A protein has these predicted regions:
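Active-site nucleophile loop of the alpha/beta-hydrolase fold
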Residues: 180-190
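Conserved alpha/beta-hydrolase
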Residues: 100-121
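Short glycine-enriched nucleophile-adjacent loop
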Residues: 161-173, 179
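Short beta-strand element of the alpha/beta-hydrolase
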Residues: 77-85
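The serine-hydrolase catalytic nucleophile loop
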Residues: 86-98
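An N-terminal hydrophobic leader/cap segment in hydrolases
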Residues: 2-60, 68-70
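Short beta-strand/loop motif that positions the catalytic acidic residue
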Residues: 266, 272-275
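Alpha/beta-hydrolase active-site loop
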Residues: 126-145
Length: 278
């Protein structure tokens, strides 16, 4: 009787693993259209003119990788580390950083998240889930090593805001004094759970499901496979964007599945700004 139950459980597990592998190996579906969903054609401020942006600097991560950032000095003592959204990099927030620094509000750091332009060995991937949090902790250690001791705000837009929330709920939750969240992405929240950001983000749902099954039983060797693609029309690409994310990068870039706990960890130390189309 016991042997029969063991065989039955083994058969069910084998079927589950085979199904997961089948879902994972299915190719990424093509993006259905090349619509300019974010209005790149009318946005003259996304990429500032060459020469107006601070030079790329580097800081050492714990694995020895030199990760890219831009620094905007200021007379203010407050430090803002502001994380970019999906696909692009810190330079997209040049105007925000320049205005804050010139006004004496904050010294601003714009990191290029690992797996993006000039940061990391592989575009669209990291080495393990949680590496982006470790990278931000290493950036803060670098900042403090430069003698900058002011209050530190961790901020971000879109996925970058999601990463800030994730940091708050993790082992590096003491990094920041406060948080600045601009339309943060929380994938499992009711407002985004079933959406694709207006056609911007295309998720390979079957592959994601298969990887979730494998990760649940401790199989992580396929986490480097891409699961999401971004719909940036070719006419508006400049070669510095990242057009797909692996499972482990995408997971690292957003709050945990229990996102309420990550949000709760911020307490009342955050400012949330959300706009609309008006």
């Amino acid at each position: 009787m016991v042997k029969r139950q063991v065989r039955r459980i083994g058969a069910i597990a084998a079927i589950g693993l085979v199904t997961a592998l089948y879902l994972i190996t299915r190719p990424l579906p093509p993006i259905p259209d090349g619509r300019d969903v974010f209005g790149f054609a009318s946005d003259t401020g996304t990429r500032p003119p060459t020469g107006s942006v601070p030079a790329i600097d580097r800081y050492p991560a714990r694995d020895g990788e030199q990760l890219a950032f831009q620094f905007y000095d200021s007379t203010g003592e407050v430090i803002l580390v502001f994380v970019h959204g999906s696909s692009y990099h810190g330079a997209a927030y040049h105007t925000l950083a320049r205005e804050l620094s010139d006004a004496g509000i904050a010294k601003v750091y714009l990191p290029n998240v690992r797996g993006h332009y000039l940061s990391g060995r592989r575009r669209g991937d990291v080495d393990y889930i949680g590496q982006l949090e470790d990278d931000l902790a290493d950036l803060v250690a670098y900042i403090r090593g430069r003698g900058q001791r002011g209050p530190l705000i961790l901020g971000g837009h879109s996925s970058g805001g999601g990463l800030a929330i994730r940091v708050a709920g993790g082992e590096h939750g003491d990094l920041a004094s406060a948080y600045l969240l601009l339309s943060p992405v929380i994938p499992l929240a009711p407002t985004t759970r079933s959406g694709d950001a207006g056609g911007w983000a295309h998720l390979h749902r079957s592959r994601l499901f298969g990887l979730l099954v494998l990760n649940a039983v401790g199989v992580t060797g396929l986490n480097g496979l891409p699961i999401i693609q971004f719909n940036k029309p070719e006419a508006f690409r400049d070669g510095t964007e990242t057009l797909d994310y692996s499972y482990r990068l995408n997971t690292s870039f957003h709050p945990r599945y229990d996102y309420a706990a990550d949000i709760e960890a911020m307490g009342d130390r955050f400012l949330l700004l959300i706009g609309d189309d008006a």
